């Protein structure tokens, strides 16, 4: 969580199969326009300042490639980020099936199941071409403990909400982490205080015995 602690900089990683519209989602959020055609991404980084729940954040967004041969690079991307947006296309059953692979990779690289992840089904405007229902997406997200939304990079539907909610997930984890650290610190102080009192009682008992002798 080092980035979040640094002036509310939040590092997010966009992951998913090739062709699902990761770049279109990112550019729509950053620049408020829809890109129809673009070269396949290997790695692009974007920054945007935004206000979420009356708090100013600087989002550092890493748009990544979906190709299998870039797995080693993807490990590096994962290590550098705090929150994740996993993208599939509602018009592609295979991209939906790949979500489990990306989720497992994140958990493996970070060695944790407690990672802020938002799963999104892009291209919700193409309902006639839909292969994955909203309920299927919702059920998978619930199974994996992820937040979920359907979006459209073309119409901008839910684009702002996706990034806002992902930042909230990162913040909740950071706040909980700090709360746990504070609790641990208080528990240690309490334990040390008890030990100190016990030692004082032992010493007092020893002194009493010595005086009696």
UniProtKB/Swiss-Prot annotation:
Which biological processes are named by the entry's GO terms? Answer: macropinocytosis; signal transduction
A cellular component annotation (GO) from this entry:
plasma membrane
Q: What is its EC number?
A: 3.6.5.2
Q: Which SUPFAM superfamilies match?
A: P-loop containing nucleoside triphosphate hydrolases
**Residues with PTM Cysteine methyl ester:** 210
For this protein, the record's PROSITE patterns field holds:
RAS (PS51421)
Catalytic activity field: GTP + H2O = GDP + phosphate + H(+)
Annotated localization: Cell membrane
What is the protein's known function?
Ras proteins bind GDP/GTP and possess intrinsic GTPase activity.
Q: Which family does it belong to?
A: Belongs to the small GTPase superfamily. Ras family.
Designated name of the protein: Ras-like protein rasX
Which source organism? Dictyostelium discoideum (Social amoeba)
Q: What is the lineage of its organism?
A: Eukaryota, Amoebozoa, Evosea, Eumycetozoa, Dictyostelia
Gene name, please? rasX
